[in-house]
C-alpha cells in the first residue's frame, strides 16, 4: 500500500516538497532498511549517542518492530518517518486494541519547517486498519508541538498523570526486566470516541515500546 502526498498542497510556502509513502514492513528491501538505519542515526544522534545506538548494524527499529510505516521522501532522501504497530495494551484492568505510534523522526535540517504536520497522513491509515484508538507516548517537552499538530484539529488528546510500563527490547543482566515512564499519553479516537478510553493511571504495554 503506497500513498504519495505532496506537502505543497497544504499551502505552506516554507515547507519543502515531500512525497509520503505508506509501506508495510514486508515490502521493505535491504536497501530500505540500510537507508532508514542511517536516517535514524542522524536524526536521533543529536539527542544523545545512546538514542542512536539501537540503529547500528543497519537496524531500522529500536524496540518493537512496526508493521507499517509512513515515510516522507524529498530530493535528499528520507525526510521524516513514523511507525505503527497494532497491539493489545492494558489500561488499568481493561485490555484494549490500539495502533501504537512510534519511531517518529524528522531529518535535522528540516526541524522547525512545519514538515511534521504532514504526519497526519497516518490518520487515514489508522481508520483503514479499524483500530479503536491510536496510542503513543511523548516527552513533556513536545506537548506544545503535539497540541499544535493534532490537538487543535481535534484529532488527538494528550493525557497526563499516567505511568506506562514496558519491557526492555533485550535482556540485560544489570537491569530489571521492565521499566516505567511518566510520559504524556497520546490518544487518537478512531473507531471509538475519546470518552470510551478506559480510566486508569497505569498502562502496561506487555512488550517493548515501538
UniProtKB/Swiss-Prot annotation:
A GO MF label: acyltransferase activity
Major localization listed first in the record, in broad terms: cytoplasm
Enzyme class: transferase
Hydrolase recorded as keyword: no
Stored NCBIfam families: nodulat_NodA (TIGR04245), PRK00756.1 (NF001974)
Family: Belongs to the NodA family.
Protein name: Nodulation protein A
Organism field: Bradyrhizobium sp. (strain NC92)
